[in-house]
From Swiss-Prot:
It is found in: Cytoplasm. Its EC number is 2.7.7.38. The lineage of its organism: Bacteria, Pseudomonadati, Pseudomonadota, Betaproteobacteria, Burkholderiales. GO terms for cellular component: cytosol. The gene is kdsB. It comes from Burkholderia multivorans (strain ATCC 17616 / 249). Keywords: Cytoplasm, Lipopolysaccharide biosynthesis, Nucleotidyltransferase, Transferase. It is an enzyme of class 2 (transferase). It catalyses: 3-deoxy-alpha-D-manno-oct-2-ulosonate + CTP = CMP-3-deoxy-beta-D-manno-octulosonate + diphosphate. One of its GO terms (biological process) is lipopolysaccharide biosynthetic process. This is 3-deoxy-manno-octulosonate cytidylyltransferase. InterPro entries: Cytidylyl_trans, KdsB, Nucleotide-diphossugar_trans. GO terms for molecular function: 3-deoxy-manno-octulosonate cytidylyltransferase activity. Belongs to the KdsB family. Its main location: cytoplasm. CDD domains: CMP-KDO-Synthetase.
Amino acid sequence: MTHPQPFIAVIPARLASTRLPNKPLADLGGKPMVVRVAERAREAGAQQVLIASDAQSVLDAAREHGFDAVLTRADHPSGTDRLAEVAAACGWQDDTVVVNVQGDEPLIDPVLVRDVASHLAAHPACAIATAAHPIHDAADVFNPNVVKVALDAQSVALYFSRAPIPWSRDAYQPHWPDVAAMPAPAAPVYRHIGLYAYRARFLRTYPSLAQAPIEQAEQLEQLRALWHGERIAVLVTERAPAAGVDTPADLARVQALFRPDSK
């Protein structure tokens, strides 16, 4: 009998969202969004679920619903930096698997969370694991808001980009720049899913790594790890994840799903 990989789930929750202020505390069926996310992480089998925030109101909401919470600095440039502070404070062993569950994804699949944690444990040469799924729509390939990842033969990340990678020259070139006329990609193209599992060792070193030029150009923080020689294992899944909550329209859509009459 195999046992699930032990892991810790940390949910970074920043209150000062530009597009949707107070997002972690938005009501979803009588509970704050961040609590709904924590429930998903607990359902995934995390041995500990921690909500990390710079806002006391978020910590109070977490504790009111039975979740551990930790106060972090307000000046973190990314969720990974916030996780790094938590990892340093908690003193986890180097190989502890820590999953960063985004605080604005109340519909995240618990199975995917668990599988990404297990994927990291199965790849001891990698510091990070994440996930991706195949893209079949050319419009998504050319959408800069859809982050793509190119993989090697072992499904380890070669590069992440907002650009179409790999570029299917023979399929795309005759139609460029008419994106609407583009056929489906000739080679597999994968959409990155923003779910990460880290080794605690890497999290503790992350703040000391200089920002990478490619990270700044693409505005993708995972490129910092690649730039500094770390390996990222990518779990390929056929199931596209549920959309997160970034805008008021997203919030209204998700709130409708949590209404009692939506069952």
